[in-house]
Amino acid sequence: MSKLYIIAGCNGAGKTTASYTVLPEILECREFVNADEIAKGLSPFNPSSVAIEAGRLMLKRIGELLSAGVSFSVETTLSTRSYINLIQQAQNQGYSVSLIYFWLNSPELAIERVKQRVANGGHDVPAPIIRRRYRSGLENFFRIYMPCVDYWMLADNSCTPRVIVADAFRLGDEVHIYNQ
């Protein structure tokens, strides 16, 4: 069965960093579609200047992978409802959809992590946007996305090592709480 992995969390939550280990080594997923990484490939010194083009290329690549029935992963903050159609389309095509949400214990920690990323040459996100996405992404995870995926996991990535807080298969199944 083909699988779609959605790697989610606020800006600075460690999604990309975790993806480079978790996806290939643990989940055996070799296709990772990430608009930020596409933008860096298009314009390494000014990725924000090609964000729209990177988004188009991301959508095109997702379509190609779905058409081929290949397992793949996407990265998102879940701050909008834009992944609902992808989830439904993938499930209609026989994909199993798993959502891994990397949570941080405060928007201030997210802001600090983004500052560290920028200091190391990574892309910036303004603090007001981080705060907005922190709130909306977490709300959308619980209200919109958890009910429609085949499996979800909530991991606290506030410190090292990350801690799995809870997970469940399908809505209505027993939720396993590992760490409160």
Predicted regions and their residues:
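A glycine- and Lys/Arg-enriched "phosphate-lid" helix/loop adjacent to the NTP-binding pocket
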Residues: Y95-F141
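Walker A (P-loop) phosphate-binding loop of P-loop NTPases
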Residues: G12
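Conserved lysine of the Walker
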Residues: K15
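The Walker A (P-loop) glycine that initiates the GxxxxGKT/S ATP-binding motif of P-loop NTPases
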Residues: I6-G9, T76
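Glycine-rich phosphate-binding loop used to anchor ATP phosphates in small-molecule kinases
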Residues: E53-L104, G137, M153
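Conserved substrate/cofactor phosphate-moiety recognition/catalytic segment
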Residues: S19-V70
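Pre-Walker A (Motif I) flank of P-loop NTPase domains
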Residues: M1-Y5, A68-V70
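NTP-dependent small-molecule kinase module
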Residues: R143-Q180
